[in-house]
Amino acid sequence: MNVLNRNINNIFFIFAISHLIVWTLIPSLTNKNLPLDTIEALAWGSNLDWGFNKHPPMSAFFSQIFFNIFGSQDWAFYLLSQIFVVIAFYYVFKFAYEILKDLKLSLISVLLLVSIYFYNFTSPEFNVNVCQLPFWSMVVYYTWKIYNSKVVNFSDCFFVAIFGAIGFLSKYLFIYLLVSIDLLFIYLIFFKKLKKFDFKYIITLEVFIVLLVPHLIWLYDNDFVTVLYGLKRTGLEYGSIINHFYQPLIFLIKQFGILIPFFFLIWLLVKKIKFKFNLKDNKLLFLIAINILPIFLMLLTSIITGSKIRTMWMTPFYLFFGVFLVYLLKSHIDLKKINSFLIGFLFLFFLSPSIYSYVSISQTDKRTDYPGKEIALKAQITWSQEFEKEIEFVTGDEWKAGNLSYHLKSRPTWEGLTTDKILKDSSQFICIGDVCLGRY
């Protein structure tokens, strides 16, 4: 039995490493330039702060760490994305075993995620959505340990607070997971009386809030610009009564569309799709809280506000759907059909990078076809003809100026949009189109 378990663990690690290698190599070989969101994160990372006009700071922080190690090597940032994805897979695998107590089913729970395009096709672009993934999975894992233990361990509470704060500082929508977990514990402690309140829960909240304080101060000092940007992205300013029905319907249709390949793999694995919900089952209750409740809260947000929920915002929400469905259907899973499942899995595993490669090579007008290196070289030549010292800052939008900040050897700081004040305060500057380069 130990040999069998060791083999399954090895299969998981082979899958994880294969995923990491494939999705690092494919975009590295087929893309000419880093994607928009990654360039934005690098632009912010050149001038780190506790927040930025579009997002909280963590995606910029991790991007800058990798830049400090590897410099302007595109493959390093595709690798960064896949490290985050694979860490998430690892904690899904660990959690699945806690729930299922079967390594084969735990492995299947992770392999099912290959059918959800958030974890392959869109994963090369390191952004706030990918940045949430490992912390989402770790919060769920350590929350489960608290939920399933008779004695609450302080270290588990501490990890939930730390990873919850980092997740929230990656993207505010992380709050949907945290609220879902809170609602679960409130239900069990104050309504069902199935758990006792533990003061370590307060410590979790305190640590979480303390870690957010610098960002909250930054938000206040900057007129809550990040929050306003997020609200603008929902289309609330164009709201109408019909949006309270139309937007939730579109949201549901998109979620179903995303999961079609997922249900196809499930169909290959089971004898029949039949299950029943027993809310007295503590494991099932937890799985509903981390899988269904965050999506329901997102749907409820759309219904109440009429807001548009963008598809990519749902990136971390499906990490544990494999565990959820395998748990529901485990009595109907037919391991004799495992070969059919593996064929379907391998088909999707290779289909996604094949499509990515085809799109990347055949379409030549994408952001990833932007000649960032060439433009940076021309900008450097233009600067060098005027000045001897190196470039210290760039201004302009995150895309054009961010590419210059990334590709120029001096790694100039991105100072935001060009303003008269920045140029007046500089000792030297030149402007090329709508981008300016200068020295302090």
Give residue ranges: language-model regions.
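Transmembrane-helix motifs of polytopic, lipid-linked glycan transferases
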Residues: L79-L100, S137-Y142
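Membrane-interface alpha helices of multi-pass inner-membrane proteins
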Residues: N47, D156-Y172, L183, F208-V210
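Short acidic/glycine- and proline-prone juxtamembrane loop motifs at membrane-interface regions
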Residues: F121-Q132
